[in-house]
Amino acid sequence: MYSGGYEAQLYGADSNRGDSVLEDTPEGSMDGMKLVEPAAPEGQENYEAFADAYENEHGERPTAWSAFTYDCVVTAALSIEAADEFTGAALGDVVRDVTRPEGEEVFTYEEAHAILADGGSADDIDYQGVSGPIDFDENGDPRGSLVVIEVQDHDYVSTEFREA
């Protein structure tokens, strides 16, 4: 396309981003390409604590996927603790409850565990993930934040942050 003189607006997702993409294309050929990828809520206090601990352990900042995975594990652990029994049906009944806005906002597993240990139920908890609030939609999917990235001068530049 580029070498033939055809100009088109290119769009992609996180799988289209990588150093090799730019290294393997002529300078300027990708300029203007826009990508949308999941984003962690940088600046959010519990995310920053998570990111600092991650960086201390691994020597680099975490990806958004690291934050999502962490929240998945915490949400699963809280569901297991809050459920009446360890079955798929029982866990499915409480997984949304431990993240509902009607509960008390908690930012760590330890805070949520304390509520359950004091006789509270899943309904009493609103776990706020390191990846942002975890409010499941009608399909059971968590809402998330996105970053819009544009290739400028043959480099990736974050141009916009959108909370879902």
Where on the chain are the PLM-derived regions?
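Extracytosolic ligand-binding ectodomains
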Residues: 1-164
